Amino acid sequence: MEKYKLIALSGSLRKASYNTALLHSIIQLGEDRFDMEIASIELPLLNIDLIDPDEPEVVLSFKQKVREADGLLVVTPEYNHSIPGVLKNAIDWLSLEPGTPLRGKPVMIVGASPGILGTARCQIHLRQVFATNRTNTLPGNEIFITHCKDKIDENGLHDERSIRHIDKTLSEYHDWITFWKRNTKN
């Protein structure tokens, strides 16, 4: 089985983030199928004046990492029923034309929240944003970790049902990337 290179983003900057802990658990679960690198989304706020004549170096480096990856994994909380600002800012930087690294990129979205809906509303908005940028977001297979305070701690995800679901979805994501690599002209 071919191992794919993924860039992974945590939509939270919080040190004790449930989603960053979840992301580390996903990296361990998928290490037989993926080489994952967590990329920082601590980028300057998007300001078109900053790209005249060139984008900031930190943004260029971030975009290059995403461009070179076989896929993009996003693990995020939900803020105010939507996408955290820091994550939306990173996606906005990636979306700039010409040469967006998002077009055609296979994307998998995961999220954890203390509430009963997980990150359902955020993921709907992310799917809309990614569709606008012509990504190949994994259909179905939503992973909403609800009541995350009971399922994730400083050691990561410990809920067996969620672990099985994520492991199954990682296999489906691997197949999704394989499909797009075989059926997309570069």
Role assignments for model-derived ranges:
Residues 31-37, 135-136:
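A generic structural motif
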Residues 1-2, 102:
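Short, flexible coil/linker segments at domain boundaries that flank nucleotide/cofactor-interacting
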Residues 55-134:
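Helix-loop-strand module that forms the ligand-binding subsite of alpha/beta enzymes
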Residues 2-32:
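N-terminal beta1-alpha1 ligand-phosphate binding loop
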Residues 11, 41, 112:
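Cofactor-binding loop segments of dinucleotide-utilizing enzymes, especially the Rossmann-like FAD-
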